[in-house]
Amino acid sequence: MNKAKVKITTKQILDDAGNEDKIELVTEATKEFNGECFIIDYDESKITESEGNKTRLRIYKDKLIMIKMGNLSTKMEFEKNKSSENMYSTPYGNFDISYNTIVYDYSLDERGNGSVYIEYKIIFGGTEESLNKILIDIN
């Protein structure tokens, strides 16, 4: 297991004019390769409004699985042109959420350094959609 510096930039497109909400997290993480994928573990912070939570990224060449554990818990799977459904658990209740991955761009080298870029839509309760973008830089 190696230490890594991870920068995660998330953007949520708020309206048709392209206004966005942007959050950037730079954190220390652990990184390992299990023969199939890179596993990145890190702690969330106040910046992400998820302080106390832990996040695990399982990064494959063709998909990424994000598991959040703590008072907010969920498992999100991102694979280009695929949809997945999940339960998002919060202190305020549980919500059904669907994810539709539009773009998945894997640019990691053999040591797991580089970036992963994802664009996806979140569908809440089958009707309300939001476009989201994630850029994960790993060094």
Can you describe what each PLM-predicted range is?
Residues 1-117, 121-129:
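N-terminal intrinsically disordered, cationic/polar leader segments
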Residues 85, 135-139:
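Flexible glycine-rich active-site/ligand-binding loops centered on an Asp-His dyad
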